[in-house]
Amino acid sequence: MQQYLDLMKHILAEGVDKSDRTGTGTRSVFGYQMRFDLSKGFPLVTTKKCHMRSIIHELLWFLKGDTNIAYLRDNKVSIWDEWADENGDLGPVYGAQWRSWPTQSGEAIDQISQVIAQIKSQPDSRRLIVSAWNVGELDKMALAPCHAFFQFYVADGKLSCQLYQRSCDVFLGLPFNIASYALLTMMVAQQCDLALGDFVWTGGDTHLYSNHMEQTALQLSREPRPLPTMTILRKPASIFDYQFDDFALSNYDPHPHIKAPVAV
């Protein structure tokens, strides 16, 4: 994942120092893009160990339409703990918007079911989009969506996906985001009987937190290793029927984990 290291170098060289909501401070660039050919390996960062188990459980949690962290806690995933209220609720975050976007008439739109049906019936559509950025409900969310919307694209029998991330914590969050959406693309491709194309990541405010600089320097001192392979072991009847044990990551040989504080 040399692209990921190149992004870090770009921020350090070309970024500007900015204040932020958390009060931590960042070095930031605006507008950046990376492209990963999913047929050439699973894009999981190798210059530090990433917790793929948490990534899988979080994605399955999104797809359930869940917005309470009980499922995550039951599976020893703590990445949302800092934002949940005393009951474990987060408000209408990703899962709610993906699976039950509210309409003015009081009904709800299941965007995931809708986009899969559209990929199957209208693969050339330019409207294969899922959005988590519901302006009318932002004030009810514990955290406004960082990975705000994504679009699918079908060409030559291959499925590609582009994510727009309006705000990106490059050291801690980005490796999770890339792996999560790459895996989602694999799942949707399987459900739609398509081969794998590219995952394209596009960032808005793309930043390194000021208290991640030592960790960034350590990571930049390491050489990337070959990408691992992700295998989906079965094809369930629906995108919503995948289980944790359906995914097998192989040949992942990362450098050691690098600990860093989360800006809340």
Swiss-Prot record:
Source organism superkingdom: Bacteria
UniProt-listed Enzyme Commission number(s): 2.1.1.45
Predominant subcellular localization, coarse grouping: cytoplasm
Record-listed (6R)-5,10-methylene-5,6,7,8-tetrahydrofolate binding positions: H51, D169, A263
InterPro entries attached to this UniProt entry: Thymidate_synth/dCMP_Mease, Thymidate_synth/dCMP_Mease_dom, Thymidate_synth/dCMP_Mease_sf, Thymidylate_synthase, Thymidylate_synthase_AS
Keyword annotations of the record: Cytoplasm, Methyltransferase, Nucleotide biosynthesis, Transferase
Pathway this chain belongs to: Pyrimidine metabolism; dTTP biosynthesis
PROSITE patterns linked to this entry: THYMIDYLATE_SYNTHASE
Disulfide bonds: none
Binding-site positions, dUMP: R21, R126, R127, R166, S167, C168, D169, N177, H207, L208, Y209
Localization terms from the record: Cytoplasm
Signal peptide stretch: none
Enzyme class: transferase
Active-site annotation: C146 (nucleophile)
Cellular component terms (Gene Ontology): cytosol
Residue intervals passing through the bilayer: none
Family assignment from sequence similarity: Belongs to the thymidylate synthase family. Bacterial-type ThyA subfamily.
Function of the molecule: Catalyzes the reductive methylation of 2'-deoxyuridine-5'-monophosphate (dUMP) to 2'-deoxythymidine-5'-monophosphate (dTMP) while utilizing 5,10-methylenetetrahydrofolate (mTHF) as the methyl donor and reductant in the reaction, yielding dihydrofolate (DHF) as a by-product. This enzymatic reaction provides an intracellular de novo source of dTMP, an essential precursor for DNA biosynthesis.
Subunit record text: Homodimer.
Protein name (record): Thymidylate synthase
Organism field: Shewanella oneidensis (strain ATCC 700550 / JCM 31522 / CIP 106686 / LMG 19005 / NCIMB 14063 / MR-1)
Gene: thyA
